[in-house]
């Protein structure tokens, strides 16, 4: 940006591009080339200049450049971007100021930039009409493409289109050049699309290619051109492509997992799905004779039986005839069966034979790897998987349910949600980046503006004026608001105005937010050094670096800046304190240009800002970060307040005045800029839309205003809305005349009321102001629609207008915050989704057209393959609408059935490709993006801040008034009573007053302390007490004044930081001690409530402390009764000191110790499990098993007695108060009551009563008692209970949302689903035979006028229907009925009402996608909030599991292990070296993969030869793996069995060898051994560590490992829910009629079957089928007198209400809650795992550290000698690696050494880690934690106390050297003295020799010391000071001290 300023922006910057310009460019390029070779090495990619992002081609010219002179529009201009100064380019600007960049070389080698032809081409290209023309062409073309059989004349239209496209491309090629240089035609990927489309068009036209329709489909790509034309779409497509890139890892993992599962499926179920029930051939056939021989297996090669009697029976033909198989009614495929005991059985007269093809046209099977893979993909996407599940269980046996459980939970839930997590993160990152970029631009523009202003001021203003203006600009940036006309002169006024208006709001927000934001905020993170350089240039233009901010040093200014920051609203929930540390580092670069004092001041300022940001509830941003006007207004006020306070001193006063004047100016300008319309419109509005005629009118107006604006009127209107909704919901079929007339009158009345409200409001407010408010416009529209509907009520076909009345429901949003928020969220995401929806529409359109073009014909020609009547089925692709419906259905996740049809008619490959593309692109990516957007607009702010202002809305005011009134009346009555009866109320009052007082004083006392704490400075010299203080204050409030939370919700969140999360971890000890005293003083405080808004909890006591406290508790049970009881009945309290009281007390103590004993608890848990297990036996066979029945009856009694005893014990031990205040105890109490009641009833002989029977079913709740006993489940339940309020809120809103659709459905379809059915065949009559109800009646008994089971006859039924549509289960039948419906009492006709499909499409988009995903949003959001409450730990985990989790997170607890010693034997040694090399490992992995490949090749019907080959290959593998095992055993000796993987390998090898010899035997009794080979694939996980590229996949697996504990708990809870529902289902639905989804295998007859059914519904699959038979309530649907042999129960009718409740509640609990919790956990852990992997140090680095360590410390002493340290550091991998020469760095690390110059591994690890991460508080915390762990795991370290450190040692050595040197010098001097004394006596010789000798000595000494010196001095500088920016001075000084001292020593 700064370089752009070289050419001053404004009109002067545009220069026409001429020959001279070209020459100049060439000259510059040549100069650069000459310079380049020297510099080439220095320039990294990072620091190369980059093109300016504001001046990219395609963007609009920045406002700063002003208007383009008219003569320069569409002309070649010199490039504005300095980056292109020496590159051959020029730009062209069109009228709309869009930038087009061209290459300045000759296009097509002939057209130079100034060639007239090229100029004309450019003019056409840049003109806006040109792109409009292309756009229209594309759209028209799309319309033509949707025609399924176009008329002949369209051929010519086709030519026209091709012509236009060719013209477009030619223009582009002429203007740009073809492909050689940058910015030419083919350099833009979007142009490739155009080019290929045109080439295809000509090829299909002139070359006869046979299958043209396939090529014609390529024309569809033209629709994609819309993307290249509309600007917003490119970015969305960019985001999509980004997310797909991100998905690569997940995709690889998914494919891998699916392959593994597919292999397992292949091994388990190969060929199973072909088992069918075959009719035993009739006795007269030749078959009977041959049966024996058949079973002896003498079949010849073509399947004919050869027999001695020579009569042949052609078995093959018999099997091939489908009519011999057993087929159920309404099914296409024969019934499957299996030979296992738990598999499906055949009816009498049939046998189970493997024959014929697989189900579903042969496409569902596990026969080859590819089909198995398809089946698993289908399982993963959960499409119609219940069918696959049922088929497989039928054919293979019920035990294989385990396989499906694994695949659904690990494959489906985990992988699909990972995809979601990745997409959401990609979206989030994209968002972050764009936001930061925007902020950076903002800042840069800001700078440029100031620059411009300064230049202009200097140029124009008189000295006095300039002085004044300088004064303005001094005030924290408010001066920037000033823009007078004189300034605008340089920018042509129009563009300036435009620019100003466009950004005024935004800037106002910026300034008033924080007058001076901390520097770090102003330039966000994403900056290359280059931009900093640019900025330095920006500043220096003014001649003084950081010109704008230097003024901060004046005291007033600094005051202002701090104050200003007080008013800055919190950005959004995500900007936490932590972000400041990161930012400050980045700021460093900027502070380089400031002088020292300034930068530190500025810096500490920014730190302080971060702490004192108060939380202002009124100023939450709306989700998309914009600021509402009210907020701007508030903020403006706040800045006034500041200036008022500043008026105290004169300079302040002066400034405040100027602020005021500036603000008024700005306000005026703002008002002007707000006006959207021309002034004449305002004149008109003033006259006609503001009614102030005469006084009497004004009085009327005032009166009306009083009435209409009163809160009670609002309340009344709200009640009317609710009533109106009720009236609309009461419509049903069949309705009596009276009822419908009541509804009609009601509607008229309500319409009247709403019309009156609107008219009165218009009178009161004037139309002009009335229509300024959104809600009023909404009201107006609805009222006018209602009036219109009254007028047009009788017009045929306009009944739809009635549904507009439903929109009235939305008026509730005004007073119902959650609904309002929800509508806002949907609104926001629809806004953000606008582009996305367009992309989705384009994708759907393209695929619909492709499908129609490719498969349309085939559907027509081969229709008999998929439909016996040879009529097109409902789902086909023969025309565009149906094709669109199929694509939409695929987007809903239902692709497999339509794909089978497609594959059957149009061939497998193409269909697979197209459907998979739609599935992957559409479903996975786009819908997930949808979800990501929804979740991102769901920040916790939205939920908490329901209203923009904290004002109460009218409704609340009205209700409050009523409440007050009621309270007043109550109090009056109470007082009368008191006066009458009591004479001493005063005493009590005083007493209460005292109480309150004491509370208050206590409160203030605590706050007092906290205030002192506030200013305890910690080591950093900054005030960290804020955290402490506010958290303490909060506790107090928490304890005493609950109401204050309700009245002032902001209180709960006022703790911006609590102690543990402040930036400054090293708090002083004194502070902590005072904290702890405080805590003691409030022992009652419950730990969980300690700090709701904060993320840090009070530290739990250490284990030792707990142990001491517990025994005290044990001795004393609580009081029996509450204080209230004791007051009323004093005899409840007994003295425990003597007599009976003492005995009672001892009894209680005994009970207490029993109840608290571990064994007691264990015993009770055991009993609970047994009693729950007993319930599972009560299935339909219980009548036949008499012994079991009697046993269960006795057991039941025993259990009941035991539980009653337990309850009594607990009552005595805990007292009623404690027992009945615990929710879990209540649960126990109620469940015991149920057992008690049924026991008593049985004893009295009432057991057959209906009420008692239904009570018995409540025994199913018994397992719930296990909840409180298993911590894992209890944790999850607590989390869930916490989420219930918000889940209920959203549920209510969804119900309201659905209500609208339900009422609409009733309006559209009530009573129209009835149809006439032939009783004998069960099929529907054709309209030609039966037209209406009376025709059907005429046919008598053989016909029946029947309704569809799930219909829209009333609102309740509508809800059920909508639930089926929303879960996509059973929705087809409802949709078919709707589409076929004609009118009430008319026989339906096939697709008569085709466009009713759209009702369902709309509902699915809004009712299903939005509302169901909102649940996910709410649940995730809630758990995040609860997580904050629980101190940032995962709430689904128990303490134990948290430990595991932490261990997983940091494997720092690893201690160095002894490596396996190398064997002494030479041969063994060689083998050992070979085996321990990485190459060996990798080669084994490759072998494993190859082994898998050979397993994949296996198919069901392979030839004998193939089988032989495969078995030989398998043999080879067994030999190889045995070889590996032997080699390892030889070299590793007994150590081989110390490694888990080795044991696994050993088992697999043994099994394989045994399996070779005993294959038949094992397969018969066990699972086939091939399965174990599949498990071997898990070993691949080991190589992931060796591959650098696999980091992403490792992250994903790590996320899974981290989620396991939590997922296990959720799984347990789900199992419990399933268990209860299974028992409930058994007792209610065991005997229903077998039809639809209930049959002989899938039913509720036994516990196992119930579980199988419930597991299937957990994913909401096929619940409609299970519900259907239960909806049969009367004959002829079912038989109430049906007899069930072996049981006394009669009838097979269901109970619809119980059934609906059962299934709906189960679906809501399991699907919405448990499954979504699953999603929440995975999303959470995925983000944690990605953060972990993004951190500079990961687990693997620690592992690698220890692996290298083992080599240097073979005996695992945990110490290493100092001399080896250098080699060790050099042997590590990065990032811990310290390459040689590293002595200096190592010494500087100051490592502690123990005797023998040894260093401990942890110390080294810490020093190295610190080097990577830099100093930080967290580091110390981590260090302590790791040391504790280390000590725990190996106590040996204690004995070695460090005696010195490396740095000390070096200093000692250096010091010693210095001392020695000085001493030598001293000796030398002495010597010289002596010599000089004896000088005279010496000869000349001696005199010459000695000095020489002395010199030599000195030289030697110096020579000695030089390396030392360099070493020492550099050691102090070697570690880079990470905290020069972030740490305040004091600490810096302290840190420097030792370094300076050491320097001093060395000198």
Curated annotation (Swiss-Prot):
A GO BP entry: behavioral response to pain
| Reactions catalysed, as given in the entry | Na(+)(in) = Na(+)(out)
Domain IQ, by residue range, is 1852-1881
Gene3D superfamilies per the UniProt record, alphabetical: 1.10.287.70, EF-hand, iswi atpase, Voltage-gated potassium channels. Chain C
Q: Where in the cell is it found?
A: Cell membrane; Basal cell membrane
- Stored CDD domains: Na_channel_gate
In Swiss-Prot or TrEMBL terms, this protein is called: Sodium channel protein type 3 subunit alpha
Question: Can you name the source organism?
Answer: Mus musculus (Mouse)
Membrane-crossing ranges are: 129-146, 153-174, 189-206, 214-235, 250-269, 398-424, 713-730, 739-763, 774-793, 798-816, 835-855, 908-934, 1158-1178, 1191-1212, 1219-1244, 1254-1272, 1286-1308, 1395-1420, 1479-1497, 1506-1529, 1540-1557, 1570-1592, 1606-1629, 1697-1722
Return the I repeat spans.
Answer: 110-455
Q: Where is the composition biased (Basic and acidic residues)?
A: 46-57, 510-529, 596-622, 1926-1947
- Topological domain (Cytoplasmic) residues are 1-128, 175-188, 236-249, 425-712, 764-773, 817-834, 935-1157, 1213-1218, 1273-1285, 1421-1478, 1530-1539, 1593-1605, 1723-1947
Oligomer status and interactors: Heterooligomer of an alpha subunit, SCN3A, and 1 to 3 regulatory beta subunits including SCN1B and SCN2B; disulfide-linked with some beta subunits like SCN2B. Interacts with NEDD4L; could regulate expression of SCN3A at the plasma membrane through ubiquitination-regulated endocytosis.
How does the entry describe the domains?
A: The sequence contains 4 internal repeats, each with 5 hydrophobic segments (S1, S2, S3, S5, S6) and one positively charged segment (S4). Segments S4 are probably the voltage-sensors and are characterized by a series of positively charged amino acids at every third position.
Principal localisation: membrane
User: What tissue expression does the UniProt record report for this protein?
Assistant: Expressed in enterochromaffin cells in both colon and small bowel (at protein level). Expressed in pancreatic alpha and beta cells.
Q: Which PANTHER family match?
A: SODIUM CHANNEL PROTEIN TYPE 3 SUBUNIT ALPHA, VOLTAGE-GATED CATION CHANNEL CALCIUM AND SODIUM
Specify where the region named Disordered lies, as residue ranges.
28-60, 493-529, 587-632, 1070-1113, 1901-1947
This protein's encoding gene: Scn3a
**PTM section of the record:** May be ubiquitinated by NEDD4L; which would promote its endocytosis. Phosphorylation at Ser-1453 in a highly conserved cytoplasmic loop slows inactivation of the channel and reduces peak sodium currents.
Question: Which keywords does the record carry?
Answer: Cell membrane, Disulfide bond, Glycoprotein, Ion channel, Ion transport, Membrane, Phosphoprotein, Repeat, Sodium, Sodium channel, Sodium transport, Transmembrane, Transmembrane helix, Transport, Ubl conjugation, Voltage-gated channel
Superkingdom in the source lineage: Eukaryota
By sequence similarity, the record places it as follows: Belongs to the sodium channel (TC 1.A.1.10) family. Nav1.3/SCN3A subfamily.
* Feature: compositional bias, Basic residues: 500-509
Picking any one GO molecular function of the record gives: voltage-gated sodium channel activity
Q: What does this protein do?
A: Pore-forming subunit of Nav1.3, a voltage-gated sodium (Nav) channel that directly mediates the depolarizing phase of action potentials in excitable membranes. Navs, also called VGSCs (voltage-gated sodium channels) or VDSCs (voltage-dependent sodium channels), operate by switching between closed and open conformations depending on the voltage difference across the membrane. In the open conformation they allow Na(+) ions to selectively pass through the pore, along their electrochemical gradient.
